[in-house]
């Protein structure tokens, strides 16, 4: 029979899941961070990743709507402000669009979602469905991938600035902000999970939630790798750098 874990052991188990399954282990990220992708492949990554960025505040709004405690809502709503900002030129979504602009992508194309890979769209929609349908505890636990974000962000920024002459530190401003936002958010979520996962069943659910979220991030990179690295099978309506040259800003 499985025993109830203490808070510290539960945290250790959650961190072990991330160490094994977080998307920093995916081959596509190794290629991105070590300068092995060309400009078109980096564009494809940024364009598809925008779908995930766009849906982060939708995910957080869905979680917020299920919180009955005003104090909890006040804390969680900061996540929405972080991404939506206080104006169209502020926040994480605006900063990601600044990155896609800097990479030479047409903003209308990026925002429209017309050129997404199906795998990207399905993975993101699966995540939204998860936080809407599962328990509040599971939804919060699914955000714990942020525990592992600072490490991958550091690798990404350093690697991209070193290897890609078409990327600037200004273009990567999104990641600078996440270096402070992600630890703040994950510290709160981890404390919440450790406090509220107070049965064997709940502890199994929060571990499964983190496992699921890791699979969402991994699936997005699988789609990118299959389409733009090997074997190079691109959905006919998805972004193709050479074919879509007329849809990319000069």
Curated annotation (Swiss-Prot):
The keyword Signal does not apply. The keyword Oxidoreductase applies. Coiled coil: none annotated. It is an enzyme of class 1 (oxidoreductase). Keywords: Oxidoreductase, PQQ biosynthesis. Pathway: Cofactor biosynthesis; pyrroloquinoline quinone biosynthesis. GO terms for biological process: pyrroloquinoline quinone biosynthetic process; sulfur compound metabolic process. Its EC number is 1.3.3.11. Pfam families: TENA_THI-4. InterPro entries: Haem_Oase-like_multi-hlx, PqqC, PqqC-like, Thiaminase-2/PQQC. It catalyses: 6-(2-amino-2-carboxyethyl)-7,8-dioxo-1,2,3,4,7,8-hexahydroquinoline-2,4-dicarboxylate + 3 O2 = pyrroloquinoline quinone + 2 H2O2 + 2 H2O + H(+). GO terms for molecular function: pyrroloquinoline-quinone synthase activity. Gene3D superfamilies: Heme oxygenase-like. NCBIfam families: PQQ_syn_pqqC. Belongs to the PqqC family. Ring cyclization and eight-electron oxidation of 3a-(2-amino-2-carboxyethyl)-4,5-dioxo-4,5,6,7,8,9-hexahydroquinoline-7,9-dicarboxylic-acid to PQQ. PANTHER family: 4-AMINOBENZOATE SYNTHASE (PTHR40279:SF3), PQQC-LIKE PROTEIN (PTHR40279). This is Pyrroloquinoline-quinone synthase. It comes from Xanthomonas axonopodis pv. citri (strain 306). The lineage of its organism: Bacteria, Pseudomonadati, Pseudomonadota, Gammaproteobacteria, Lysobacterales.
């Amino acid at each position: 029979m499985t025993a109830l874990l203490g808070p510290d052991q539960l945290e250790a188990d959650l961190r072990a899941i991330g160490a094994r399954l977080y998307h920093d282990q995916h081959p596509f990220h190794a290629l991105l961070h070590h300068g092995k992708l060309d400009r078109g492949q980096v564009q494809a990554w940024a364009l598809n990743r925008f779908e995930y960025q766009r849906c982060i505040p939708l995910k957080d709004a869905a979680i917020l709507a299920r919180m009955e405690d005003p104090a909890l809502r006040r804390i969680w709503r900061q996540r929405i402000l972080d991404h939506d900002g206080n104006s169209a030129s502020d926040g994480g979504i605006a900063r990601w669009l600044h990155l896609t602009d800097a990479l030479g992508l047409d903003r209308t194309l990026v925002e429209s979602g017309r050129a997404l890979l199906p795998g990207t769209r399905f993975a993101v929609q699966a995540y939204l469905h998860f936080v809407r349908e599962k328990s509040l505890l599971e939804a919060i636990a699914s955000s714990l991938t942020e525990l592992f974000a600072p490490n991958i962000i550091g690798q990404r920024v350093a690697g991209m600035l070193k290897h890609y002459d078409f990327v600037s530190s200004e273009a990567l401003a999104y990641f600078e902000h996440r270096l402070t936002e992600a630890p703040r958010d994950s510290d709160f979520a981890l404390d919440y999970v450790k406090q509220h996962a107070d049965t064997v069943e709940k502890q199994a659910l929060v571990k499964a939630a983190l496992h699921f979220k890791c699979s969402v991030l991994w699936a997005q990179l699988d789609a990118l790798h299959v389409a733009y690295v090997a074997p190079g099978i691109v959905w006919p309506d998805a972004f193709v750098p050479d074919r879509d040259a007329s849809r990319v800003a000069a």
